[in-house]
């Protein structure tokens, strides 16, 4: 309302040659006529000719622009000649008439006009608030007593990375073609959508485009290449008999459920014009759910050279996820996903069905629906399992807790632990093997009592203790800290007080802590259940054995060799010859040596003990200073 009060008159005329001529003729005495159609102009020209005024012909296809219309002389009601006003309409007035002028309404196309007016959506820069947005509304309200559009998106201005207006004089202009040629139009478009709400001013940061390219599009391409490479090796045919969703692994069912959840939210956010939120959520799904979790946890399933139910399940799941992701990304970044979709299905993603259609709709498909049409350009989403999603979220939280435990304890990630325990929380037995591999522990067990891994520790509360102990406060504090049996001391304190070096120590004089016993480390996470939050603790056994040290060394060697294979751009199925010289390193057990050879696809694998001279072209690395 305040904006409309501040608006001045719209300039309806301009002293220009090009444009829509004002259809107004004026006599010298001030009489005016406004002509509303070609038929009306023809009639007025005929009257003027009959009155003796010379006029050119006025056919049905007469050119209504200058200089043609300026050649017509009309007749006033008092018999005077009338000439056209020498002005053209303001171009914004033309734009305001676009909804009906495009159909030549009211003379033609009434049905098409009625079907398209008011329009569903218009979009322009914020500077059009006083321009096109206003003239559309003003003309529509005046002529039709109605709005011209149902929804209007006013885009914020694009500024430089520091929030300053771009200008040649400042030298802060960004040439979009620099980014199109370097990172590609896909990454540029995705960055501009995800950088912020579209109605806010945007600080365009070239580094953001590069980060988007690396994080989003390289990740998506790598996921596709991972699937395509193994699919080619195995001769995978997506049209062949699939594995029913209900018979797939929990990991497969989880990522399909997440796909359902993310796709539904993506659709809803687009419908509500929250484009930035939609694309951020989808990017998080691609990077964290698909690449960093599903693909990473599924690599070994595809390494098996023999055909298996589990491998086929993984291949179909990856294919279905990629196909649907391509459809979701396409409206914003259309190029790379079209290439991927053509390779997956043989058809363009831009002719595929939107994945939230019928049957199934936003509620998704039943498991049977999904199995029947998943290999075809389906219009349904896979079945959703929110309980499974919450459970997997807890599993991932515990995996992250395990990484934090190792960092805090200074224990490298590839050195396995003998055992891990999950204390409290829901049943995760279905994921114990997955979690054990992710945490790099030999076994996962369930424990109900966290006290098994903790001990009591008493600390003095100096603020309460000092007035009692006075000069002996430090001695009393030391005695409390170094108590031989802190649990017995705490029991005495809580039972009326305990005498410590002649000072009565009460409950307010101490602070009670529980810390991990020697050889254990723990972290506690909170997770939401159906109606309440759960506290779940993860405990790791931090003690080392020769067997664990051997396995840890084997894992570090494999990582180095795999990185070298990648540097050499070796094919997945390529075999190598491997020699390893070990100096001041833990003894490698026979089983771990065989594992190294298998994991690295080494046809020959030789281990040299300390004292052997490494080859001149060998690569040296240290593990924990060794």
Map each language-model feature to its residues.
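Feature 926 captures the class I aminoacyl-tRNA synthetase adenylation module centered on the KMSKS loop
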Residues: 9-93, 97, 143-185, 209-626
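Single conserved hydrophobic/aromatic residue that forms the stacking wall/gate
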Residues: 1-8
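Aromatic-residue-lined binding/catalytic grooves and analogous aromatic/hydrophobic interfacial grooves
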Residues: 106
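A short glycine/serine-rich beta->alpha loop
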Residues: 116-127
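Structured mid-domain segments that build the active-site/substrate or prosthetic-cofactor binding neighborhood
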Residues: 194
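Short, solvent-exposed helix-loop connector elements
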Residues: 200-209
């Amino acid at each position: 309302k305040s904006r409309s009060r501040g608006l001045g008159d719209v300039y309806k005329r301009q002293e220009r040659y090009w444009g829509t001529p004002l259809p107004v003729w004026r006599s010298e005495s001030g009489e005016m006529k406004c002509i509303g159609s070609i038929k009306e102009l023809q009639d007025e020209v005929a009257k003027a000719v009959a009155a003796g005024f010379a006029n050119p012909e006025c056919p049905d296809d007469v050119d209504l622009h200058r200089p043609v219309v300026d050649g017509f002389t009309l007749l006033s009601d008092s018999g005077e000649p009338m000439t056209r006003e020498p002005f053209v309409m303001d171009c914004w007035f033309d734009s305001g008439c676009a909804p009906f002028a495009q159909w030549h309404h009211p003379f033609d196309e009434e049905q098409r006009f009625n079907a398209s007016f008011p329009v569903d959506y218009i979009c322009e820069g914020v500077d059009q608030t006083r321009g096109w947005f206003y003239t559309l509304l003003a003309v529509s309200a005046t002529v039709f007593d109605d709005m011209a559009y149902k929804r209007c998106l006013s885009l914020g201005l694009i500024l430089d990375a520091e929030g300053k207006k771009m200008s040649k004089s400042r030298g802060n202009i960004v040439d979009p073609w620099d980014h199109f040629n370097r990172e590609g139009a896909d990454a540029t478009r995705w960055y501009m959508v995800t950088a912020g709400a579209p109605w806010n001013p945007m600080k365009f940061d070239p580094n953001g485009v590069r980060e988007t390219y690396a994080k989003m599009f390289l990740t998506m391409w790598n996921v596709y290449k991972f699937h395509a490479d193994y699919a080619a090796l195995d001769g995978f045919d997506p049209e062949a008999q699939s594995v029913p969703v209900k018979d797939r692994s929990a990991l497969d069912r989880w990522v399909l459920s997440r796909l359902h959840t993310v796709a539904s939210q993506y659709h809803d956010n687009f419908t509500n014009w929250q484009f930035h939120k939609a694309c951020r959520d989808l990017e998080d799904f691609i990077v964290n759910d698909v690449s960093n979790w599903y693909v990473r946890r599924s690599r070994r399933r595809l390494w098996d050279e023999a055909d298996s139910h589990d491998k086929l399940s993984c291949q179909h799941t990856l294919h279905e996820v990629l196909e649907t992701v391509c459809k979701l990304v396409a409206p914003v970044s259309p190029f790379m996903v079209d290439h991927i979709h053509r390779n997956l299905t043989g058809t363009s993603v831009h002719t595929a069905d939107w994945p939230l259609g019928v049957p199934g709709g936003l509620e998704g498909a039943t498991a049977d629906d999904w199995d029947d049409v998943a290999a075809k350009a389906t219009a349904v989403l896979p079945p959703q399992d929110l309980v499974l999603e919450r459970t997997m979220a807890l599993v991932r939280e515990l995996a992250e807790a395990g990484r934090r435990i190792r960092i805090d304890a200074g224990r490298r990630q590839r050195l396995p632990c003998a055992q891990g325990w999950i204390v409290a929380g829901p049943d995760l037995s279905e994921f114990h093997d997955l979690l054990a591999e992710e945490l790099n522990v030999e076994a996962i067990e369930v424990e109900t009592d966290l006290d098994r891994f903790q001990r009591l520790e008493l600390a003095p509360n100096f603020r309460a203790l000092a007035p009692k102990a006075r000069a002996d406060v430090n001695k009393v504090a030391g005695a409390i800290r170094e108590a031989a049996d802190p649990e017995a001391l705490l029991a005495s304190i809580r039972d009326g007080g305990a005498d410590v070096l002649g000072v009565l120590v009460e409950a307010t004089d101490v602070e009670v802590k529980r810390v991990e016993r020697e050889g254990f480390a723990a972290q506690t996470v909170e997770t939401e259940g159906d109606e309440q939050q759960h506290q779940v603790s993860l405990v790791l056994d931090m003690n080392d054995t020769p067997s664990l040290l051997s396995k840890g060394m084997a894992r570090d060697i494999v990582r180095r060799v795999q990185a070298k294979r990648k540097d050499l751009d070796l094919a997945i199925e390529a075999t190598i010859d491997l020699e390893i010289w070990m100096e001041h390193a833990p003894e490698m057990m026979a089983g771990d040596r065989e594992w190294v050879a298998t994991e690295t696809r080494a046809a020959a694998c030789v281990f040299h003990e300390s004292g052997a001279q490494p080859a001149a072209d060998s690569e040296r690395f240290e593990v924990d200073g060794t």
